[in-house]
Amino acid sequence: MASFHSHSPSPPAALSPDDAPQPRRPSRTSLHDAAAAAAPALSPESPGHELEDGADSSEFNADDVPVEVLVKHLLAAKQSLSSMTLVLRANDLATSARQMHQEFVILSAQTAFLRHGILQELHILHQLRRGMARAYDNGTRDFKHIIRTLDTADGRLEKIMQVLRKTTVENVFRQPGEEPKCLLDFVDPKIVEQVRDALKESIHELSAAKTSFDGDLLRFDTDLRTLTDAMAAAASLANPTTTTPDGYPPDQRSIPNLLSALSEGSHLMAEHLSSLTRHFDMCVTAVRTTEGGAALARRRAAEATSSDEDQAPVSISGVISAQESESGPSAFEPMDPLERQELLHVVMRDAAEVDDVVADIHNVLQQMEMDHASLHSLFSASRASHAATLTCFSMLEEVGARASSYVAAEAEFMQRWEDEKETIDENVSKMDELKKFYEGFLNAYGGLLLEVERRRAVEGKIDSIWRKAKEQVDKLVEADKREREHFRLEVGDYVPADLWGVVDRPLGRWAVVPLEDTREGSYEMEAHGEPENEGKVETAYERETEPSTPTPRKMPLNGPGSAGERPF
């Protein structure tokens, strides 16, 4: 059997024959150390009880113990039994701790299962978000590339249009009195504006699709961030904010230790109460075996109850009355002197430890209250974390319901993107075709200028040839004139007038005219004199209105079959 706690530095004697000598230890200060220390208890009365120290037993004299001292110890023992409420409280704490631990295990398992599932779903949602981000980034890169491509194509088109705008049409291609024009006046600018408007509309649609998808991504990010924060908050709730007496928050790993400490504390307090009960029984026996002890005990109990109102009432009448009724009318029962001496020796020795045992019960209960508070804090934190995790699960259901709309938004964004890209590619191709057409137009105009110059050169050569021919004809006409005059002088006096008519006919005049008259005058070659339009030879081609080259033909002004025709 164990003994009461004692603050005495020397070890006490054994309380029973079966007890081995044990040193007394200081009052218990922590339930966590209770498992390592033996629990003290009062020694029970035993008929064969042997004293721990023979010298002490021989020196002790039961007759020297006044009855007042025994009654005092009896009342103190009875008063110590009021700690039964503390023991009951300790039992309630231990029972509550076991119930909380059972519920804690269930809640922890459910929370861990829910949390694992939510984290897996959250990981899938993050993967979905990364896929949407890649689609958004690819679209953004394509958008920038499209803008650069459009700027380049529009810049090339605008450059060639500027060249057309700065290129003035030569006078030779304009009607008389017509205002100056540039090459851009010969093309339809509405086509370019239509292409540009179509491109602007496509860019606007791409921007709208990008903005709409960006809004969906922001809402998705908000959902993920809210769910992640809620999960972090739920995890943080599993760690209580309260602190233990040592200044540190309780840890879930300490729950087994707390349960063990509460169970050991409850068991230790029950042992203390059992020891106090045995000590009270021995005090009752000691008083009953002492002459006048029962009556004095009842009187002192009544006086103690009436004198101190703050103190709990002490009632021993039931115990003493029952013993007295069992023992008959006598107020005291004789007992073997040796047994009585041993009994009183144990009572006197244990009486000094009653206060220590009661104080130890209070200390143990105080520590149990703190341990129970720590365990309750962990349980409350676990319950709060479980409730928060359930809230996260509800949030996950809502996010999952909206996830389909986010996926649909991604598909819509990609479809709109592809459609508008196809439209933009078509319009860019149109811009390239317009650029090529305008370049061809500009090159054709340059070729047209070269063709005009070439034709001018050809007509100049033709003019030169006809001028030389005219000079030869003029020489022939002059020679013919002289020959005619010489012939007339030689034979004119001899030829009759009837025969002279054909010979006297003037030399025919010739002119070179184009099949299609593209000039204001023509070259006429007369046998008698200069050409009528000699001064207009150099300017005839400058008044050209058609780019075609005329095919000249030679025809007589007065040819055969004309009026006055006579054979030569």
Swiss-Prot record:
Residues 1-59, 522-568 are annotated as: Disordered. Residues 522-546 have a biased composition (Basic and acidic residues). GO terms for molecular function: molecular adaptor activity; protein kinase activator activity. Keywords: Autophagy, Cytoplasm, Membrane. Pfam families: ATG17_like. One of its GO terms (biological process) is mitophagy. It is a peripheral membrane protein. One of its GO terms (cellular component) is Atg1/ULK1 kinase complex. Its main location: cytoplasm. Belongs to the ATG17 family. It comes from Neurospora crassa (strain ATCC 24698 / 74-OR23-1A / CBS 708.71 / DSM 1257 / FGSC 987). This is Autophagy-related protein 17. The lineage of its organism: Eukaryota, Fungi, Dikarya, Ascomycota, Pezizomycotina. Signal peptide: none annotated. Autophagy-specific protein that functions in response to autophagy-inducing signals as a scaffold to recruit other ATG proteins to organize pre-autophagosomal structure (PAS) formation. Modulates the timing and magnitude of the autophagy response, such as the size of the sequestering vesicles. Plays particularly a role in pexophagy and nucleophagy. InterPro entries: Atg17, ATG17-like_dom. It is found in: Cytoplasm; Preautophagosomal structure membrane. PANTHER family: AUTOPHAGY-RELATED PROTEIN 17 (PTHR28005:SF1).
